[in-house]
From Swiss-Prot:
It is found in: Cytoplasm. Belongs to the IPP isomerase type 2 family. This is Isopentenyl-diphosphate delta-isomerase. One of its GO terms (biological process) is isoprenoid biosynthetic process. FMN binds at residues 65-67, 95, 124, 186, 211, 216, 262-264, 283-284. It is an enzyme of class 5 (isomerase). Homooctamer. Dimer of tetramers. The keyword NADP applies. Its main location: cytoplasm. Mg(2+) binds at residue 155. It catalyses: isopentenyl diphosphate = dimethylallyl diphosphate. Its EC number is 5.3.3.2. Its cofactor is FMN; NADPH; Mg(2+).
């Protein structure tokens, strides 16, 4: 594939992603908090700091991986980096493979660090990238963490995608052992299982982003790029973010779990934190905001999102993220069926 074709693919991904819409109904709607009428705290008591063994984020919300690798996506990364700088959010760039192949593309990613020199930035590579390239991806952005995306359904629907996956787990293990910053194993919208969590724990992984279905749909994106558009029947493949978080429960004491995929509102973010996530990521909401409404409007959107999270936590009498994990939740029969059939051991306050 030529550099021009790769740039074109990056732009196509963004164009199709922006055209997608949020689900009107999701698994986040299949779980409810129990309301208690009189809180014992005030809004000013709320501490939204997200703390993991290696990373401290001012807020449990981050701009998740989306783009880079073309002139248009450079402009997007520049604007998102300004939003991150002005709001204190962490930010992940999209796959840096384009820059690792062609130094001319490096600036489409490094613009994020240029615009946000003191901020928290995650670099991003695929599970098949050589260890030396993973190290280069971290150095490229002076990144505080490295996302490794695992995206087999996307690759298999992508006309020019990868068809070989046998070496992925061993390669991830090699990267984890060599990279000096936290390595986050990140799905791309298909969710995670307890079996995967077991395998990742065995090779020393300490961070995952479950990225469940319900948000940006890369099966649909790649199917749109197919000549016959003949794989749309896989559109609903995978686990939702709620199901994925439940799948991680037994591993949350050893692995820091981030949640993304289909988060629409501050309430969805709070529900993710209540299910054990340490932070929540969003891609398309930020992309659409900054492209359609500009930087200032997106900054205001983030500030409002954070304030709404504080209001919800006040209603729940939760001073911090850890408190949220003790709050009472009622699940729908469908989610309870998933828990039962998957033999998940769920204990709640």
């Amino acid at each position: 594939m030529s550099d021009f074709q790769r740039e074109q693919r990056k732009n196509e991904h963004v164009e199709i992603a922006m055209a997608q819409s949020d689900a009107m109904y999701s698994d986040f709607d299949k779980m409810r908090f129990v309301h208690h009428s009189i809180p014992s705290i005030n809004v000013n008591d709320i501490d939204l700091t997200s703390q993991t063994p290696d990373l401290t984020m001012a807020y449990p919300v981050y701009i998740n991986a989306m783009t880079g690798g073309s002139e248009w996506t450079k402009n997007i990364n520049e604007k998102l980096a300004v939003v991150a700088r002005e709001t204190g959010l962490a930010m992940a760039v999209g796959s840096t493979h384009a820059a690792l192949r062609n130094p001319r593309m490096a600036e489409t990613f490094t613009i994020a660090r240029k615009m946000n020199p003191e901020g928290m930035i995650f670099s991003n590579v695929g599970a098949d990238v050589p260890v030396e390239k993973a190290l280069e991806a971290v150095e490229l952005l002076e990144a505080q963490a490295l996302q490794i995306h695992v995206n087999s359904p996307q690759e298999l629907v992508m006309p020019e995608g990868n068809r070989e996956f046998v070496t992925w787990l061993d390669n991830i293990a090699s990267i984890v052992s060599r990279v000096s910053v936290p390595v986050i194993i990140k799905e791309v919208g298909f969710g995670m299982s307890k079996e995967l969590m077991h395998d990742l724990q065995q090779i020393g992984v300490k961070y995952v982003d479950v990225s469940g279905k319900g948000g940006t749909n890369f099966v649909d994106i790649e199917n749109e790029r197919r000549a016959n558009k003949d794989m749309d029947y896989l559109s609903s493949w995978g686990q939702s973010t709620v199901e994925s978080l439940l799948e991680t429960t037994a591993y949350q004491s050893e692995i820091s779990v981030f949640a993304s995929g289909g988060l629409r509102t501050p309430l969805d973010a709070i529900k993710s934190l209540a299910l054990g996530a340490k932070a929540t990521g969003m891609s398309r909401p930020f992309l659409n905001q900054v492209e359609n409404n500009g930087i200032a409007h997106t900054v205001a959107y983030v500030e409002s999102f954070i304030e709404h999270m504080k209001s919800i936590m006040t209603m729940l009498d939760a001073k911090n993220i850890d408190d949220l994990t003790q709050k009472q939740i009622v699940f729908s029969p469908e989610i309870l069926s998933w828990i039962e059939q998957r033999s998940l051991n769920i204990h709640r306050g």
